[in-house]
Amino acid sequence: MEYNAFFPPHEGLRLKDIADLFGAELSDDAAGERIIRSVAPVYRAKPDQLCYILSRKSGEELLTCEAGAVICDAALKSLIPSHIPALISKTPHTLFAQVGALLHPSAMRPSLVARMEAEISPAAYVDPSAKLEPGVIVEPMAVIGAGVHIGAGTRIGPGVVIGSDVQIGRDCTIAGGASILAALLGNNVIIHNGARIGQDGFGYAPGPRGMLKIVQIGRVIIQDHVEVGANTTIDRGTMDDTVIGEGTKIDNQVQIGHNVRIGRHCGIVSGVGIAGSTRIGDGVMIGGATGVNGHITIGDGVQIAAMSGVVSDVPAGTRYGGIPARPMKHFLRDMADILARAEERDKKTGEKNNG
């Protein structure tokens, strides 16, 4: 890949300094002065770039690798060509993430779009009653309503709408085109482009002439270190709050219904829809395009396979998949049985046609 102007290389760090900083073992002390400026995949990494491997599947690519160093665990060190030093770590994936963030800090959250001479653009609207702590940046066309409180170091992107009385913590980034209503955000929260936070939930009751709208007077509570992907929507509660727990990461185009409570350090992949009033524990991982029924409980540490349909409670510490979602071993057994039946049917159909 040619020079990337969006994320230019770092001015350079020595391999020995990277190893010392993150507690990794450098396989060749003589390579400690080598300068690393960026990261890249194994197949195209150059001498000033780091790459990483997690399995022996990368062995063939390593034969022609030109990387400045390869991050791996001790069990895979033997795969690394002798001319390339290894950075050995018990958690190579984590180390790669840490080094990447160090080399490319601007890629860790949405960047400023406008070149600004002042912290608050004259093309933005900030209500006189709003309180902005020092260092808040507000880009053009943003609208900040009455009674809003925004913490120090937070960046508000172009075209963002922040409704009245919303509170946003410190060192947050609200990217262009997002809207935040009836919400309280903690510190170090990232909201990506086009996300919608705090609009009313989908609540209706049957009436004599059709559907009657049910009042939605709850809030959205987003705790510290949460990241919300582009075009994701999080509805405010009906009467209670919708809550996103500390450290949870939500991908693009996820729908979270009213009154949902998601625990700490969960991962929710794109296309997931979570219906109202569902409770999700800590450390839960939900694969892409999964549908989650309302008014159910998913326990701590659950893993749900992509494109599943979760219709009832899921016990803590389990792995579920399929439609309807069931324990993974049952799902895999059922799939094997279905495939075997299909093959048998095809075989019989072929014999009949050939007869």
UniProtKB/Swiss-Prot annotation:
It is an enzyme of class 2 (transferase). Pathway: Bacterial outer membrane biogenesis; LPS lipid A biosynthesis. Homotrimer. It holds the Pfam family Hexapep. Belongs to the transferase hexapeptide repeat family. LpxD subfamily. This is UDP-3-O-acylglucosamine N-acyltransferase. GO terms for biological process: lipid A biosynthetic process. Catalyzes the N-acylation of UDP-3-O-acylglucosamine using 3-hydroxyacyl-ACP as the acyl donor. Is involved in the biosynthesis of lipid A, a phosphorylated glycolipid that anchors the lipopolysaccharide to the outer membrane of the cell. One of its GO terms (cellular component) is membrane. It comes from Agrobacterium fabrum (strain C58 / ATCC 33970). One of its GO terms (molecular function) is N-acyltransferase activity. It catalyses: a UDP-3-O-[(3R)-3-hydroxyacyl]-alpha-D-glucosamine + a (3R)-hydroxyacyl-[ACP] = a UDP-2-N,3-O-bis[(3R)-3-hydroxyacyl]-alpha-D-glucosamine + holo-[ACP] + H(+). InterPro entries: Hexapep, Hexapep_transf_CS, LpxD, Trimer_LpxA-like_sf, UDP_GlcNAc_AcTrfase_non-rep. Keywords: Acyltransferase, Lipid A biosynthesis, Lipid biosynthesis, Lipid metabolism, Repeat, Transferase. Its EC number is 2.3.1.191. The active site is at H258 (proton acceptor).
